[in-house]
Regions:
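A short beta-loop-alpha structural element at the N-terminal edge
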Residues: 7-21
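Conserved beta-strand-loop-alpha-helix junction that forms the acyl-donor binding cleft
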Residues: 96, 100, 125-137
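Acetyl-CoA-dependent GNAT
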Residues: 13, 27, 39-98, 109-111, ...
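Conserved active-site tyrosine of GNAT-family acetyltransferases
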Residues: 140, 145
Length: 147
């Protein structure tokens, strides 16, 4: 069994190229995602700007899971800037297929939930999942999400 060093940290502008490559890879690994073989339609400059915007916001999170220095998963919470709905976070979590069923998705989601609880802004989290993705549905229910 291979050992990995896990590092969780917020995305930085310098991660833009690696993040695009990661999202393009995971988009082709699963048909449960809205991303597909076409990948993410952002260039490196646009991704860097997106990351910078997320980092500057008090109601958004873009957390990477790095295994031995390579992106293996991510969780994000995005929310609107409009006052009436800025407390509602949309959760997105994805893990490379090579690391499915090893607890990385749970680790990422638990970190995101902890962040949301301490954010002073986010009061409700929502996510979308295909019901045929039984492992994800089980995880989300286990962490308190309702379908």
């Amino acid at each position: 069994m291979t050992e990995y060093e896990l590092c969780l940290r917020e995305a930085e502008k310098t991660d833009a190229a690696d993040l695009i490559a990661f999202l393009n890879q995971v988009g082709s690994e699963s048909d449960y995602m809205t991303l597909d073989e076409a990948g993410i339609l952002m260039n490196q400059e646009e991704m860097a700007s997106f990351i910078e915007h997320q980092a500057a916001s008090s109601n958004q999170l873009y957390l990477l899971a790095l295994l031995n220095g390579e992106i293996a998963g991510l969780v994000s919470i995005t929310a609107d800037f409009h006052e009436r709905i800025r407390h509602i976070g949309q959760v997105f979590v994805v893990v490379k297929k090579a690391f499915w069923n090893q607890g990385l998705g749970r680790i990422l989601l638990e970190e995101a939930l902890t962040w949301a609880e301490s954010s002073h802004v986010i009061r409700r989290l929502e996510l979308s999942v295909q019901v045929r993705n039984e492992r994800a549905v089980h995880l989300y229910k286990d962490l308190g999400f309702e379908l």
